[in-house]
């Protein structure tokens, strides 16, 4: 149901934040500075 979807989304979000945090920050920085 919807609750399990929310759980999966939260878990995916945590995993992404942990694994992709550094990449995400670099991506945001390059977007802001138009260096991508």
UniProtKB/Swiss-Prot annotation:
Keyword Disulfide bond attributed: yes
Any one GO biological process: defense response to bacterium
Claim: Disulfide bond is one of the keywords in the record: yes
Disulphide bond pairs: 30-36
Source organism, top-level taxon: Eukaryota
Pfam families reported for this sequence: Antimicrobial_2
Localization (cell): Secreted
Tissue specificity statement from the Swiss-Prot or TrEMBL entry: Expressed by the skin glands.
Alphabetically ordered keywords of this record: Amphibian defense peptide, Antibiotic, Antimicrobial, Disulfide bond, Secreted
Entry GO CC: extracellular region
Protein function: Antimicrobial peptide.
UniProt record similarity statement: Belongs to the frog skin active peptide (FSAP) family. Esculentin subfamily.
Protein name: Esculentin-2R
Organism: Pelophylax ridibundus
């Amino acid at each position: 149901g919807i609750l399990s979807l929310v759980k999966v989304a939260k878990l995916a979000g945590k995993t992404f934040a942990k694994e992709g945090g550094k990449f995400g920050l670099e991506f945001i920085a390059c977007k802001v500075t138009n260096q991508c």
